[in-house]
UniProtKB/Swiss-Prot annotation:
SUPFAM superfamilies: Clavaminate synthase-like
Cofactor notes: Binds 1 Fe(2+) ion per subunit.
PROSITE patterns referenced in this protein's UniProt entry, alphabetically: FE2OG_OXY
All copies of domain Fe2OG dioxygenase, residue ranges: 78-178
EC number: 1.14.11.-
Sections of the chain in a coiled coil: none
Cofactor(s) named in the record: Fe(2+); L-ascorbate
Binding site for Fe cation: 96, 98, 159
GO biological process, one term: intracellular iron ion homeostasis
Binding-site positions, 2-oxoglutarate: 169
Protein name in the entry: PKHD-type hydroxylase Bxeno_B2194
Molecular function (Gene Ontology), one example: L-ascorbic acid binding
Species per Swiss-Prot/TrEMBL record: Paraburkholderia xenovorans (strain LB400)
Length: 227
């Protein structure tokens, strides 16, 4: 399931983040690459753990914590501290799949990457190219979103970033370990949660059907989740 989350950051928050990022020192993006990705990747990245990465990453994690749609879709157990990349002058990232396990450098913190996320930090009219292209059984889905919007998708997906031919594409990317590791089970819970919320808005939270479906949701979550 690929999901577009609108307005994870406000335009003001994006501007504040960009002020920090644009003043930071960037390095070769292959510092976080596995062997396969290193052969496919051409971009720049903020050093993990740098002051700029921590400051903007904290702002993103705070915003995610206030976003009920993100929680419903991801059911997050752990979130890898956000990383940041920059594409310009023909930079791109050929087709690859993300590593299954991500470990924070110099620490014991590691996660299973169930979901990948890209939060766009440049408006699409400021650059050309740079589409995030995600493959699944239904074809290729392309994301080139307004600044502050985020795309969430299974980390098992083949994906690539098309070359940026004009301007600069800046984004944050990170991974989520979900309480529910199976993509199909997680998608079922997300759909059920949306249906319950919609029915509750129509009939009230005390309606018998709403109460029953809420119970089914939590019992499925209890069956499938690792917390």
């Amino acid at each position: 399931m690929m999901l577009h989350l609108q307005g994870v950051l406000s335009k003001q928050q994006v501007a504040q983040c960009r002020e920090v990022l644009d003043a930071a020192q960037w390095i070769d993006g292959n510092v976080t690459s596995g062997e396969q990705s290193a052969q496919a990747k051409r971009n720049q990245q903020l050093p993990e753990g740098s002051a700029a990465a921590r400051a903007v990453g904290d702002a993103i994690q705070d915003a995610l914590g206030r976003n009920p749609r993100f929680f419903s879709a991801a059911l997050p157990l752990k979130v890898f501290p956000p990383l940041f990349n920059r594409y310009a002058g023909g930079d791109g990232f050929a087709t690859h799949v993300d590593n299954a396990i991500r470990q924070l450098r110099g620490t014991d913190f590691r996660i299973r990457s169930d979901l990948s996320a890209t939060l766009f930090l440049a408006e699409p009219d400021t650059y050309e190219g740079g589409e995030l292209c995600i493959e699944d059984t239904y074809g290729v889905h392309r994301a080139r979103l307004p600044a502050g919007d985020m795309v969430l998708y299974p980390a098992s997906s083949l994906h690539h970033v098309s070359p940026v031919t004009r301007g600069v594409r800046v984004a944050s990317f990170f991974w989520i370990q979900s309480m529910v590791r199976d993509d199909g089970e997680r998608a079922t819970l997300f759909q059920l949660d949306n249906d319950v919320q919609r029915l509750a808005a129509e009939k009230g939270s005390n309606d018998a059907t709403v109460v029953s479906l809420t119970g089914i949701y939590h019992n499925l979550l209890r069956r499938w989740a690792d917390a």
